[in-house]
Each structure stands twice: as structure tokens, then as C-alpha cells.
């Protein structure tokens, strides 16, 4: 008997010890995502000593951004606010987080600016959850932001979106799964306004490990009467309010008055959800009663409510409430039969956020992610939702939109000229609504996959200029007969069914004709040698368009001279003298006909430009002729050797003179004006003198060449595009151009028109006035237009104009040029002038400068600047 009793006591004490041990363990962090943004990978993970939370580096969850450290003035107490990540590049930068679908998550973003960049300018930007805007962040009044959101897929994207000149940044990103039967999210996500645990005896936060969901409860002093207990308070509700919160509370200082609270809103139209947390923590005598009404303005959430003894309970409004005048008044009103005043432990107040946009169809998103991973694509715009919001959709694709609540579908994908290699990825077939697929001008190998024929929505497939091999699938050829537009030029090893059979038949007769072919080849070579000895570069007649399946590139329709690669080598003395280097390749000096200097631009094998841009530039320069557009002497299109031969500009480009790279005296103000007037005339001709009209798309100071008389020649037409006339106002196209000069409206919308060139020209005009870089190479990277706009508010022209001019200018002329420039860079394209208006205004500006200073233009400048502007209506414009 005694032995049994001893064994029982051992069992009881052991059970108590195990229970105590279990209770001492911190809550499970399963499902938590705790990112210290910018934390070096070699310091990850670590355990926060204050909370016991394990934080990891964010490096595996985002592809962009740079690491920073908060300055010494950063007062945050948590380790994770020491590091940060900032995003100087791109508009939208997104974290990709794997979550459980259909679960309520608490999402918390933390910001510790700490003057990390030394600029002491608080960033402003937007935060998005998936395709929807969550909050506009202003870190001058900043704090951590928190939202409760039910996930709609297994991938959650949190995006920082640049909205102005400052750079978005973030210190910490945390996700905590909640119970779905607690907070109401069916009316929309819940953006936290405040979460207060009422007590006047303590400060700081209550969070994990006291709160198993890691909610941050702010101990808040309402200057009322404190109530607290040391007894255990149970929590059986889905909210599981931490015991540290439920053990304290407040009652009104005047027991006969209500407890009053309020919620302040940013907008009168905002709606709120309020959660009141109670627990009776005072021992009531037999004749005592605590009973009160819970009121949200005029609505009674619950009448005659009595808290449960030593057990937490939560009451809330079942539908979002709209308050008057931007303030919501909350009251706990004692009932007539109550002997005790109201008591409350905590309040959580949320704004109900409208997330109107459905995410892009998840199968389309998964397909795009697979394609991105398959080819190792790293594109700054390919972040966040592919289609939504429309202004931020991914480059190179188009989507169909039914309404905001219907997931968009991807209907067009253009991956041409992306340097893609390998086979055509199977993931393309998962874009089941795709109508147009352009994979041209890449290096795809292998056969044309049969799954393309099973993509029922496809109506256009462009596979030109790849290294595809083998026969075309029969099903695909059948689809072509029924309306599918299939182009496969430039794939010499690709054949349709008939041509493949012919190739097989030819294997039997090769021995018969081999000797004959050899003789014919020898004769042909001898004839070619004789021909080339008699003439140098030859006139090329127009050739018929090459149909798909033929091995040769389509010929460029031309009446100018086509050079062989060996001739180009001879003209440049085997590429002896380098003039410069750009995105196309290296530019060499050459001599034509023994006396005429020329510039030869040779396409490099690693060039970001491809045959498409080369062809576009040749075709444009063959049909446009203007004294302020660079003249094409000839071109080389031989196998992989591509070259453009231009008239030589011995004075380099405008950028070199503005930056001082070429040495010598800086350009005078009158010379700068003359150059921009001539450049404006060239652009005006492209916009109004060409049929169809053209947009240059890459106007910048490095593309303005200067001949021996310093006459301006606009160059580099590889990105030029025609634009619509008549009723249409724009053409939709993938964004192309140079950062800093790129029209921001075109960047956002992909809608191109001639006003995009006007914006770029305005930036050029600001450059010749200030001689400042378009984007300063500082961490903040201020843009020249923003800087000039700020300086002009002071009204002092000397702070804006290039100091190297030594005030040697007519101030009225400079002011007028500044006004023209600022009108050109207006954010709205509709408010920008046309190039014709700009040209006329600048001519007046130049006349004003010359007349005020008594300067007479030389004949060379007059012949260009004073040229008449009569335009032709013919298909081919007249030379000017």
C-alpha cells in the first residue's frame, strides 16, 4: 500500500513538472514568416532576445533592392530595425511569400528610416498587397503598418511602389496566421488603426510570447481608474486575447459616467470594425452587478452586457460601420440596474479596406513564373501581379479585362529579341487564353513543339530568326490553313512536311550531281571575282519578300549602297580607329572613295540591339532625308555581320561638349540654342514631314551629333516607331528608351505618341541650360526636371544656368528656353506642346538672343535654322 502511494506521488509530481515545463516553452512559431530586410545572409537567422522570435534574411524572398543600415539616430529597440532594404530601381518591387490559401494572416511591415542615406528626407511611397493598394506610406509620420488579410492563393506578394522622387525602403516584414473564426475579413481586409491594452501603470508593448499570434498591444493610459488581478484569466474565444492584457483594465474615474473612446479616420467615407475585449477581474459581492451597453455611435453592438468572471470575451460590430465627420465615437454605458461601472481590457480598431482588383488568373501567373525561371529572365518590371493594376502590368505582355472582380487573362506575350536560348518551354501551353506569341529574334533550338497547335486561342505565332530544326508539326500546319498566322523566317534548318520530303528525296541524287555542282561553283566564283574587281559597292535591287521556311533574312528594300564585310574592313583599315561605343556596338572611323570620312557602326555579338533594330534604322534612314537627321552612306548585312555607314560628325556628340569631355571652351549660349533649334527641326520633320509619321523614342544628347560646322544631326533610329494618325491617339508598345529621358506617362501606360519625344527633348533642353546630369549619381538620384522645378520656385536664374557661361547670355532668352523646357516635361502628354510649336518658340528665343547681343548668324546656321517648313503629303517625303 505504501509503495503504491509513493508511486502515485511520483507520478503526480512528474506530471506537474512536465506541465510546468510545457507551460514554460514559448508558443509555436509554425507558420510565422519573420524577415529582417537587408540582413546579410551570413548573419541569418538569429533569435531576437526581447521576443524570442526567429528572424531571417529577406534575400530569398525578393530579387531587387539594395542593403542599407539605419544611422546612429535610429531609436528603435528591436534588432531588426538596424538593417533595411531600399529600392532605387523600378517602380514596383515585390516580396514573394508562400502561404496557405484561404487563411487570415496578420501582415506587418516595419520601417526604420534612421537617415540611412544621409539625406534626412523621409520617403513616401505606396504599399500594395498583390494587385491592390493597401496604404500610402509617409515615414515622416510613419509607424509600422499592419493589416489582416485572407489569402486568395498560395503566393502572397507585398509590393513597395514608388510614387514620387523618394526611394521606398523597408526594415521588417512579418506574417502571422490567425484563426479564420476570429476577425471578419469577408467585407475587406482590416487595416489596423490602433490596438490598445488599457492600463495607466505600465508602458510599452505586449506581444509574443505573451500573445501566441504576435499581435502588438500598446499599453495605453486613458487616465481612468485602473483595475488588475494576479489571478489566471482563461481565454476560450477564437481571439485568444493574451492573459497579460486580460489581467488589467480600466473603469471610468466617475463611476456614474460612461467610458468613452474614439477612432479617428483619414476620410469621411472610411468604414470601421471595432473589437472590444472584456474580462471580469474584480470579485463581485452577492449584491453587485456589472452591466452596460456597448455602443458604436448610434448603433448598439450589445445591450446589457456583463463580462464573464476571469474569462476573456470579445464583442464587435458584425458589419462595417461608417462614421460621421471622420470620427467614430465608442461608449460603454452603465445600465440602470448595474451597481458597478463599465470595465474594459482592450480595443482593436480597424479600417475596412477596399481591395477591388482580382489577381491575374493563377494558372497564367504560374505559367509566367515557370517561363521566367526556365530562361532565367530577370526583368525589373516582372514583379507583382502580371496584369493588375493595369498601369503596372508586366512589360511585353497584354491582358484582357472583364471587370475588376474577374481575374484578368494574359492574351499576348512578346519575348522577341531577349537573347533566349534552348527549347521552347512547355510552360507556354499553360497560357490557355494566349492569342499572340512572339518569340522571334532569339536563339531557340530544337523542334517546333506540337503543343502550340493545341493552344486553341492562338491566332499569331512569330518564330522568325531562331535556330529551330526539323519539320513543322502537321497539326500546326493544319491550323495555319484554318487561319493561324505562322511566321518562321530565318530558321534555315526548319521545314514544312513537303520540303522535308524533298530533302529526303535529294539524298538519292546527290552523287549524280555532285561533280556538276562542283564545276558550277568554280565558274560562279570566278565570275564573282571579275564582277567585284570592276565595281566596288553595288546597287541592290528590291527583292521579293521571303516567305517562311526559306533560310535567308528578308532583304531591306533599298536604292542605296550595300557593302560586303570585307569592304567594310577595308574602309576602316581593319577597324583601326575607334570613335566610340554604345548599346549597338563599336563605332569606327572610315574613309570612303579615298577622301570622304565616314563613321561605321558595327553590331557586336553581345549587343542589346538585334537585327530588328538594325533593320528598322536602315529602312527609316533610306526613306527620310533632312539636313538635321544623320545621313546613311550605306550598310552591311552579311551573315552575322551587321554594320551601318554614316556621314562622319567630327565634333562628336552634344553630351561630350556639355560634360567637358572634349575639352576646350564650353559652348556659348547662342551655340547651344542653335543646336537645339536644329534638333527640334529634325524631330518636327519626323513627326509631321514623314508619312507615316515617326517617333524617335531615344532623343538624348548622346544621339545629337555635330558636324564640322557644329550643325546638329539627330542619330540612332533603331528604336523608332511609326504612330497613328487620324482618330487614334497612340500606339501600344513595349517601353523602350533611356532612363531619365523616358516619358514617365509612356513608361506607366505603354502608350506611345509623338509627345513622348517632346518630353525627351525637354530633358535635352534642360541639359543645355544647366549642363547637369539628367540623373545625379547620388543615392537619392534626383532627376534634372525635379531639380530645375525646385530651383525655379526661388526665381533666381543664376542657380539654374550653367555657371561656365559666366552670365554671357540674354536673361530673357534663357527664361524663355526654361519655360519651353518645363512645358515639354509636363507629366501629362496632353499638356505638352507639339514639336512644331517648340521649334517656332525656340527660333524666337534664338532671334531674341542674337538681336539683343547684336550677333549675326553665319550662313551655315541660317541655312539650317531658317529653312522653310513646307511638308509633302506623298508616301515618300521630299528631301529637305
From Swiss-Prot:
Residues 533-880 are cytoplasmic. InterPro entries: Kinase-like_dom_sf, Leu-rich_rpt, LRR_dom_sf, Malectin-like_Carb-bd_dom, Prot_kinase_dom, Protein_kinase_ATP_BS, Ser/Thr_kinase_AS. Residues 573-846 form the Protein kinase domain. Glycans are attached at residues 180, 201, 228, 254, 287, 403, 430, 441, 505. The modification Phosphoserine is found at residue 732. Residues 854-880 are annotated as: Disordered. Its EC number is 2.7.11.1. It catalyses: L-seryl-[protein] + ATP = O-phospho-L-seryl-[protein] + ADP + H(+); L-threonyl-[protein] + ATP = O-phospho-L-threonyl-[protein] + ADP + H(+). Residues 861-880 have a biased composition (Polar residues). GO terms for molecular function: ATP binding; protein serine kinase activity; protein serine/threonine kinase activity. GO terms for cellular component: membrane. It is found in: Membrane. Residues 1-24 form the signal peptide. Pfam families: LRR_8, Malectin_like, Pkinase. LRR repeats lie at residues 409-430, 433-455, 457-476. The modification Phosphothreonine is found at residues 564, 733, 738. The chain crosses the membrane at residues 512-532. Belongs to the protein kinase superfamily. Ser/Thr protein kinase family. PANTHER family: LEUCINE-RICH REPEAT PROTEIN KINASE FAMILY PROTEIN, OS07G0107800 PROTEIN-RELATED. This is Probable LRR receptor-like serine/threonine-protein kinase At2g28960.
